Regions:
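Membrane-interfacial terminal anchoring regions of lipid-handling membrane enzymes
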Residues: 1-47, 71-74, 187, 219-243
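Non-catalytic C-terminal accessory region of glycerolipid acyltransferases
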Residues: 4, 131-243
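Catalytic core of membrane glycerolipid acyltransferases/transacylases, capturing the structured
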Residues: 25-50, 58-59, 74-129
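Short gly/ser/thr-rich secondary-structure transition/capping motifs
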Residues: 59-67, 127-131, 191-194
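Glycine-rich phosphate-binding loop signature in dinucleotide/nucleotide-binding domains
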Residues: 73-76, 141-143
Length: 243
């Protein structure tokens, strides 16, 4: 079976599974309490994407090294997980490893037929709600959630990282939780800015996710933001030089 056919099968399988989950999610949300439903919703998304990447690797389409993130699964208390954002796959790769993960999503994705109902069931957070987004993010962290944020705000255009947007370090300060960095490295162009979902890249797509430095929350959240941006830029440059 050629790589393009395997790629098409993977996309079709993922679309089918997500569609089924999005049909089930509204029903489950009516049957389960808020607390239990949120837990089921987040674990369900992690299970779906972990299975998807397992299939992708078995088909020879991807090689993923993300095992280091498993150390965060059972860590108690709230935590912000901050990652650079080279491709559209990043959130799905991290979510697969974090069953307590909470994503901040564009409003249009929360209306998407393949993602919306499942994301609402998991109580993911809209990124266009202003102070409401801050309030929801802090509340989720205080409930023990692991909040995934991309400080660049969108996929990287200028390597190694684009300028970081304010907000992540303010949320950490308000919730009094640390920021755990995750460095994502890939030389594949697939789903980088402007790359369409259905356009097949050279295979296999090789992606590595590794845990980086952890930053404490601080009242001077702007200084922490600057330090965070410098850290990501330095680590990604050093990693490429060492490769």
């Amino acid at each position: 079976m050629g790589s393009r056919l395997r790629f098409a099968l993977l996309i079709a399988l993922l679309g089918f599974v997500l569609l089924v989950w999005n049909l089930l999610s509204p029903v489950l949300s009516l049957l389960l309490s808020r607390r239990v439903g949120t837990r089921v919703g987040r674990h369900g998304i992690a299970f779906i994407f972990r299975g998807c990447w397992w299939v992708a690797e078995r088909l020879g389409l991807m090689r993923i090294d993300a095992a280091s993130l498993d150390a965060l699964r059972d860590e108690p208390g709230g935590l912000i997980v901050a990652a650079n954002h080279p491709t559209m796959l990043d959130a799905l790769l991290v979510a697969a490893r974090l069953p307590r993960g909470v994503c901040v999503m564009k409003a249009e994705l929360l209306r998407n037929v393949f993602l919306g109902a499942g994301a609402r069931f998991a109580r993911y957070i809209r990124n266009d709600a202003g102070r409401g987004m801050l309030r929801d993010a802090v509340a989720s962290l205080k409930e023990g959630g692991q909040l995934l944020l991309f400080p660049e705000g969108t996929r990287t255009v200028r390597w190694p990282v684009d300028a970081f947007k304010p907000g992540i370090t303010l949320i950490a300060h308000l919730a009094r939780v640390p920021i755990q960095t995750v460095l994502i490295e890939s030389e594949s162009p697939y789903l980088t800015k402007g790359w369409p979902l259905l356009r097949a890249p050279p295979f296999p797509v090789v992606i590595r996710l590794r845990l980086g430095k952890r930053f404490a929350h601080d009242p001077d959240h702007r200084a922490v933001l600057r330090a965070l941006e410098r850290y990501f830029a330095s680590e990604l440059v050093d990693e490429r030089r060492a490769a």
